Amino acid sequence: MQEEKSAVYDFGVALLRLLNYEGDNTMIRQRKEMSFMMGGKKVDAEADLTIVDDNYCYLVVQENKRIGSPDDPKAQLIAESIAAFHLNAIRRRYEGNLPPLERQVIPGITMVGTSPIFYRTTVTRSLLNNLSSLQYPSEETVVLRVGMTTVENRRIVLQCFEAFKPLLVCGRLC
């Protein structure tokens, strides 16, 4: 089973590198550990793959590693997006003269087999505070999702990966 997980990670890394997601100042990390507070307790969220630089996390990728599994990696991806926002907010606070991070669009990808689904999750300071105190969020959390369902659309999938790349620039704290 560990070998299968490794192959899934390797495929994801190879695909992101092939499409130039890794740049001069960014790198692909596997199994990035992040966390946030929920109900006064630390919640861990380990992303399968992330695009990071020295300070920030820009993209999270969650893979469903069990072939034929009905598990949907969407909930895990959203938790990782919240944890990435929390990490980015903490790091931004220590950078100096920057205003606090109030909201950020976190791009994400889930992979079920070789089929990607692309996400844009808007995470806010308010959502983080509500989760920390177990209060129902006072504002709507927007999660946009676009996916491919047929294997014949591989060319289109690669075009989606290319089109998705500019979100990394926007995701860098806009």
Predicted regions located by residue number:
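Charge-rich, low-complexity intrinsically disordered linkers/tails
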Residues: 1-72, 149-174
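Generic detector of low-complexity/intrinsically disordered segments
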Residues: 130-136, 146, 160, 169-170
